[in-house]
Amino acid sequence: LYGETTGSDITLYTQGDDVKQEQIYLPSNSISIYEVCITGLCTGGSSGIVGDYKTNRIMGSLLVENSGGITKTESLDTDLGNSGTTGNISLDVSTSNIFSVQCSASANVSVNWSAVVKLYINQTKVEI
């Protein structure tokens, strides 16, 4: 997933496709472990210093009910290293089987974000 933002929120896109928002669709009646490795690299902006960065690894679980409702448990958010000012990372879920990676840059800071998302999914035919 990839995206660039300056002082605003963004949902990351697949392979740099900025036309459609990338949302990861999860199957109903499933439990998943997620692992998200994400990097943010400052490319400028009136308040940004080129080369500032942020790296995180986030892990947790996602229980998806038959209705599409998701219970997200974030059990590990590891700061792997950072320098200067970049922004914030959040993981979002909806009530329609959707999981997404969202980032925001600090005010007047331009940041390129990149994430690798791994999902380990166990699905059943029994309604949860």
For the regions a protein language model found, what residue spans apply to each?
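Surface-exposed ligand/attachment interfaces on beta-rich extracellular proteins
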Residues: L1-S32, T39-K54, N66-S110, V126-I128
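Residues within well-ordered beta-strands of beta-sheet-rich folds
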Residues: E35-C37, V116
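Compact beta-sheet-dominated globular domain cores
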Residues: N56-L62
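Edge beta-strands of jelly-roll/beta-sandwich modules across compartments, strongly enriched
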Residues: V109-V117
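Short beta-strand-to-coil "C-cap" segments at the C-terminal boundary of structured domains/repeats
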Residues: V117-K125
